[in-house]
Amino acid sequence: MWFKNLTVYRFNKPFSVDTEALEKSLEDFTFSPCSSQDISKFGFSKALGKLGHTLVHSAENRHLICATKEEKILPSQVVKEALEEKVAQIEAEENRKLAKKEKDALKEEITTTLLPRAFSRRSQIHALILPEIEMILVDSSSATKAEELLALLRKALGSLPVIPMSFKTPIEAQLTEWLKSNSAPAPFEMQDEAELKSDSDEGGIVRFKQQDLTENEVLAHLEVGKQVHKLALHFGQSIAFVLQSDAGIKRLKFSEEFRAHNDEVSTEDPLARLDADFALMGSELIALMNSLVEVLGGLEDSL
């Protein structure tokens, strides 16, 4: 339930979501396991996992969705060795060299033969659709995986007018100024981790972890032109995270004190607790995004 990373997109055209219509749209793209000949399958699954009953979990016009991916694990080395053995056998029997086209056909045949015996692995990715702040937050550190989920959602809905979140002023310029002044704008506080990078290829990258960022050693790198591309921050007393210059938010962690707000919810009803946690997380993520947009100088105008 609790998101661990954020890849953020914003709507660049008006967008409204009707829970019932969204549920119906996703139903046509529900996840189903791989058959014996499938290399991978990707589709929507229950938003709240085994405890849930729907593909979309909504509250206060905030919508949680989940997609499941199953992939067959067929090591390329296994296919390569089987192919080499088969090619050697045929070339010896027929006393000739096989053409590339023939080898490609053999490779496909071998893959088809091996797939039913291959192990598979599953992964899930969640996203939070937030019309009130015109954003979609994807719980992934990988833009590629986030785009894969959005592509599936776009296919289900017919259209999805979103673009990656970007700001009027480069994030690295803002973070560099914060570090120079040893002060992040409220309600954010700098922590003890940063990554500094030079604009030139020769300048290199310097990483600091568990270190006082006000020390001269750190500031010296700023004086020679390096900029801050990653900075660990706290949002009030609720969230710790690392903000990146590409607007990615990594290692998102909600504090124990914040999560304890729902301790009074009965543990005898796990679904009720999940619902309460969803509401709590959604509200705080909205507050986080609104504050980030404000202190970073506003979002870049849509094209």
UniProtKB/Swiss-Prot annotation:
Its main location: cytoplasm. One of its GO terms (biological process) is regulation of DNA recombination. It is found in: Cytoplasm, Nucleoid. Keywords: Cytoplasm, DNA recombination. GO terms for molecular function: double-stranded DNA binding. Pfam families: RdgC. GO terms for cellular component: bacterial nucleoid; cytoplasm. Belongs to the RdgC family. May be involved in recombination. This is Recombination-associated protein RdgC. It comes from Shewanella loihica (strain ATCC BAA-1088 / PV-4). The lineage of its organism: Bacteria, Pseudomonadati, Pseudomonadota, Gammaproteobacteria, Alteromonadales.
